[in-house]
């Protein structure tokens, strides 16, 4: 689930395409976001062993040190957390932005 969204079926697949995920129109509609219930489903789904529920909390509160300490930069942006969240929190979107911000901060230190 690490690819890019394609809006129509006319897009070509290339040698580097590792898989295709087709969703129905119903499956592409995100539910209404609610508060995180800390169920841990996103952490269980994360192949990198991260805790997306914490990362999104830190990101929303602009807690850059905590994001770096919790290795937001190690997120592979697979989207497993997004699909597993019963609260419909856009975890991947939030974490992707935070990851970019933390990587920029790390680069400025060098």
Task: List each model region and its residues.
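Redox cofactor-anchoring modules in respiratory/redox and cofactor-processing assemblies
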Residues: 1-87, 92-100, 104-110
